[in-house]
Amino acid sequence: MSKVIGIDLGTTNSCVAVYENGEAKIIPNKEGKNTTPSIVAYTDKGEVLVGDPAKRQAITNPEKTIYSIKRIMGLMMNEPNAKEAQSKVGYKIVDRNGAAAVEIAGKVYTPQEISAKILGKLKADAEEYLGDKVTDAVITVPAYFNDAQRKATQEAGTIAGLNVLRIINEPTAASLAYGLDKKGEEKVLVYDLGGGTFDVTVLEIGDGTFEVLSTDGNAFLGGDDFDNAIIDWLAKEFKDENGFDIKNDKMALQRLKDAAENAKKELSSAESTEINLPFISMGNAGPIHLVKSLTRAKFESMTEKLIDETLDHIKIALKEAGLSKGDIDEIIMVGGSTRLPKANQVVKEFFGKDLNKGVNPDEVVAAGAAVQAGVLRGDVKDVLLLDVTPLSLGIETLGGVMTKLIDKGTTIPVKKSQVFSTADDNQPAVSIHVCQGEREFAKDNKSLGMFELSDIPAAPRGVPQIEVTFDIDANGVLNVSAKDKGTGKENKITISGSSGLSDAEIEKMVAEAEANKEADAKKKAVIEVRNQADALLHSTRKTLEENENAISEDEKKAIIDAAADLEETLKDENATKEQIEEKLKTLTDKSHKLAEAMYKKEQGEQAGAQPNQKAKKDDDDVIDAEVE
């Protein structure tokens, strides 16, 4: 059986490893380095350069040199991050069927195609090192990558000629490399600050089991943002002195980017650095030079909010894991940007303990991917990896409520089912609207997709049994099916590709969910009592119509009047929960005589009002489904 390689496809740099002779080994590239710049360039001669050769010519070829492509993987052009991404790069980002792509010399390339060039080089380097053909790989992604981004990564692997056996999260991969030989039980926090993404994951490691307890992060927070802070500062200083924006010059922007990256690296060990860019532009009086001194203190002041945000994600991850900072045994720093002194200082002060520096931050993720490859190949025994889904998943039900089937933090792979029903009599079809997020209402969450189950036999509301099943595989790809249990008819949808969430949207939803928790709860309570009232009206009128002679005319009139009163209240969109409940109670009270008559007539079968049932984890529960 051929070797299976592990690949860390990074925003700034990528790395490849293999598991052999009982350990993960980093494979050097043809240039003799353990990491390869995630840069692709197209030259005027028609050559395609990847890695260091592409990086070396970037300043003289800015519009045809593609870097940080990972930031637009699976990104839709109508998402805020697309516009921001264009303002930070020298190449052109364009709309390709709604998705972000790049245009080079009039030709459009997808992020998958560009990423495939990087993966192709890593594959070739691995084949040269191993002396054998490589086809299978495990590729890592940020823990907060959405469905579209994960799918795009898989497609990039396919384009590169790789069979992607598994997509795993970067912090989880790092924990595999760290904890493979650990014997005791530990609670570990992985702080992964890379070139373009940030993830924090809390795991419990012990006896070969790696269980993710929680994860949080931002796929648009990383080393690029620290570079951009310096670039923006330099551009502002230049504009203040010269009166125009130097960033409009693509070649000058590339020089600023290189200078900012170098300054950031120098400030990791020095207290100050000089940025010297001669002939950066031309003015009326001749050439303009840009020379600035930047201190570490100034740099840390400019990027303080970025570091503080990483702490916010740590706090969320700890809360969701049900742990305090004192419960964490080890803090593992992963990603090249963890070389920033301020990042180390802030995390160390927060936990009040030393950080684990025993892993190489640039290589540990690829090493972990190689370990997972070894597990899949059978070379690594007795290792169980339990990862989680980052956000709740569910469907829209009556009143616009999002009914969750899979909660945030659920271990994957996972398959869960729940039975729903129709909201109207003789309803011929139901629309299944799949949503992702933490808010109480579907409209406040991300719509992942919609499909219809039709040809439902005519039946009273609440009778059809529609079983909805959510199935998430080990790669995080979601499949949803709906089945009429009465007829066996089924319809399915795979949630992948461009329908996924952007990470900025995920962050926003989580924050909004917390901020609007109380308001959402009140709105949900009104929806629920409205549903209850609607169901009572329906059942009471139907029962009264079928048994109008069972009670007196006065009792019948009292029920009709109470029903009309409740119906009038429901027409008022601003009616409060208490107002509806008052009218609901009146109708219930007036219907007691009818219920008693039915009880006597049918020997104990209650025919009174039945409130809508709430969704539960039990598959046999039935609740109203939203109808489009």
Curated annotation (Swiss-Prot):
Region described as Disordered: 595-628
Transport found in the keyword field: no
Residue positions, PTM Phosphothreonine: 197
PROSITE patterns: HSP70_1, HSP70_2
GO molecular function: ATP binding; ATP-dependent protein folding chaperone; unfolded protein binding
Keywords annotated in UniProt: ATP-binding, Chaperone, Nucleotide-binding, Phosphoprotein, Stress response
CDD domains on file: ASKHA_NBD_HSP70_DnaK-like (cd10234)
Keyword Transferase attached: no
Biased composition (Basic and acidic residues): 595-604
UniProt induction comment: By stress conditions e.g. heat shock.
Entry's family note: Belongs to the heat shock protein 70 family.
Its biological purpose: Acts as a chaperone.
Protein name, UniProt field: Chaperone protein DnaK
Species: Aliarcobacter butzleri (strain RM4018) (Arcobacter butzleri)
